[in-house]
Regions:
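Conserved short histidine dyad/triad with adjacent acidic residue
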Residues: 24, 38-55, 175-192
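A short, N-terminal "cap"/entry segment at the start of jelly-roll beta-barrel domains
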Residues: 1-38, 118-174, 257-275
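A short hydrophobic beta-strand segment most commonly corresponding to one strand
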Residues: 60, 88, 102-118, 197, ...
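A cytosolic small-molecule/anion-sensing beta-strand core signal
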Residues: 64-65, 82, 101, 201-202, ...
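Short, conserved beta-strand element in jelly-roll/cupin
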Residues: 43-44, 54-70, 180, 191-207, ...
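Short beta-strand segments in beta-sandwich/barrel cores
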Residues: 49-51, 66-72, 86-87, 186-188, ...
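Short acidic-glycine-tyrosine-enriched beta hairpin
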Residues: 75-92, 212-229
C-alpha cells in the first residue's frame, strides 16, 4: 500500500495550474501507478469557464464544495453542480464547465493520465493507450437522490455507510463510492481482487498496514491506496467522509467477507512497478 499527500505532490511538481490559472489540479494517481485509472484533487476559482472535450477518456467529477454548471454543447442541456453531484463525460461529450462559487472536486480518468498533460485546443488530453469506443453520452448522478431511494449500503462489516455511485454496469472502467465512517469505527479490510484508492474529504483517523505494522494519519487531502497484498485496518478518530475508487469496478451489491474482501469482478491491474 502507499500514501499520497498534497505536500508530497507539491514537492514532486505534481500540482498543475490549468484553465488560465483558475484551476489547481493535484495529480494523486497517474498511469505509472498501474491501478487502471488516475485521479486528481481539483480546486477551481469562481469565474472559471472552460470548454472541454475528452475524446480519448472517460472522466468522472464528484463535487465536494462550491457551485457551478455543466452544459452539453451538443444538446444545449445544462445541469447545476453542487456538493454530492457526480457527472461523467466521455468521447462524445464536448461540454462547458463553469464555476459560479469557488469549487472543489475529485476527478477520475480512465484510461489513466500520465500526469503531465495539458489541454489541447479542443479542451482534451492526448491519448494514453486505447480509449473508450462508445456511443454513450454524458450523465449525472446525485448522492441525495441515491440515498433517498434507499440505495445506500452498510459496508465494511457494519463499520461504514456507502453509496455506490458508479458500478460495473456504468462501463467507464472504474467504480466510485461515497463513504462515511462514524467516529470510533474500526474495520479490517483486504482487497484481494481489486485496487482501491481512498481520498479523505473530511475527518481524521489512521490506516495501518497489517503486514508491516506501519501506520499513517488520515486527514483531508490524504490519499491511501491498497491492493491485493494489503491487509489493512482503518480507524476513524472522528467522523470520516471519503471517496473510494475501485478497479476493476464493483458490481455494486458486494458485501465484505470475513477477511474484509469483496468478490472478484474482473482482471486486476498490476499496480505500481515492483508491487
Amino acid at each position: 500500500m502507499f500514501i499520497r499527500t498534497l505536500d508530497e505532490l507539491a514537492a514532486a511538481g505534481r500540482i498543475k495550474s490549468l484553465v488560465n490559472d483558475t484551476t489547481r489540479s493535484a495529480r494523486f494517481l497517474t498511469a505509472a501507478d498501474g491501478m487502471g485509472f488516475s485521479y486528481n484533487d481539483n480546486r477551481v476559482s469562481k469565474g472559471s469557464d472552460a470548454v472541454l472535450w475528452y475524446k480519448h477518456h472517460w472522466e468522472a467529477n464528484y463535487i465536494i464544495a462550491g457551485r457551478g454548471e455543466v452544459t452539453d454543447l451538443t444538446t444545449g442541456q445544462s445541469w447545476p453542480l453542487e456538493p454530492g453531484v457526480l457527472y461523467v463525460v466521455g468521447p462524445n461529450d464536448r461540454h462547458r464547465f463553469r464555476v459560479t462559487e469557488d469549487e472543489h472536486h475529485v476527478s477520475v480518468f480512465c484510461p489513466p493520465l500520465r500526469g503531465d498533460e495539458r489541454h489541447d485546443e479542443d479542451g482534451g488530453y492526448a491519448a494514453n493507450g486505447p480509449g473508450p469506443q462508445t456511443d454513450r453520452r454524458m450523465f449525472l448522478k446525485r448522492a441525495d437522490e441515491i440515498r433517498a431511494a434507499g440505495k445506500g449500503m452498510v459496508a465494511a462489516n457494519g463499520q461504514a455507510r456507502t453509496l455506490r455511485m458508479l458500478t460495473k454496469a456504468d462501463d467507464v472502467g472504474f467504480g466510485f463510492s461515497d463513504v462515511h465512517f462514524a467516529a470510533g469505527a474500526e474495520a479490517t479490510l483486504w482487497y484481494k481482487h481489486h485496487w482501491e484508492a481512498n481520498h479523505i474529504i473530511s475527518g481524521t483517523g489512521e490506516v495501518t498496514d497489517l503486514t508491516t505494522g506501519q501506520s499513517w494519519t488520515l486527514e483531508p487531502g490524504v490519499g491511501y491506496n491498497v491492493g491485493p497484498k494489503d491487509r489493512h485496518r482503518v480507524r476513524a478518530h472522528t467522523d470520516i467522509h471519503l471517496v473510494s475508487v475501485f478497479c476493476p469496478p464493483l458490481e455494486g451489491h458486494e458485501l465484505h467477507d470475513a477477511d474484509g474482501a469483496l468478490a472478484p469482478s474482473d482482471p486486476v491491474p498490476p499496480g505500481p512497478e515492483g508491487y
